[in-house]
């Protein structure tokens, strides 16, 4: 009597890495779980949350793509507590722009603190600091 053998399950593709998500057009920030956390902004003036101006230095929002989230630190120079650098992944087109960060708003809270950085509320920055997920997708 022949014994039936079960076929091994087909290999599955690895899941996409978990990431934080920032949507410049709306300012929406989502946690790696997909949960909406709140809104931030990027860029200023005509470039405020305007992805069509992502190539404009010091005005447009952070360019779409993937970024590594650096270690968080407190910046006494004006960016506030719980600040991090964003390092673009190799496939991200930055249009020659650099120095992107996630930081807090200015004291006026009038959406003028960004020259391309992501400005996010403190509770979101605190959540990012505590998270093991260190990838941000700007969509």
Model-found features: residue ranges?
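Exported/periplasmic cell-wall-interacting domains
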Residues: 71-139
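Gly/Pro-biased beta-strand-loop elements
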Residues: 2, 6-98
């Amino acid at each position: 009597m022949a014994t039936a053998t079960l076929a091994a399950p087909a290999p599955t593709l690895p899941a996409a890495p978990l990431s934080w998500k920032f949507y410049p057009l709306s300012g929406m920030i989502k946690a790696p779980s997909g949960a909406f956390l709140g809104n931030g902004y990027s860029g200023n003036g005509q470039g405020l949350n305007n992805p069509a101006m992502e190539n404009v230095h010091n005005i447009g929002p952070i360019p779409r793509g993937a970024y590594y989230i650096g270690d968080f630190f407190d910046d006494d120079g004006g960016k506030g507590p719980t600040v991090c650098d964003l390092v673009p992944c190799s496939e991200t087109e930055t249009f020659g722009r650099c120095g992107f960060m996630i930081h807090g708003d200015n004291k006026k809270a009038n959406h003028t603190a960004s020259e391309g950085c992501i400005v996010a509320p403190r509770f979101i920055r605190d959540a990012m600091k505590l998270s093991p997920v260190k990838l941000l997708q700007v969509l």
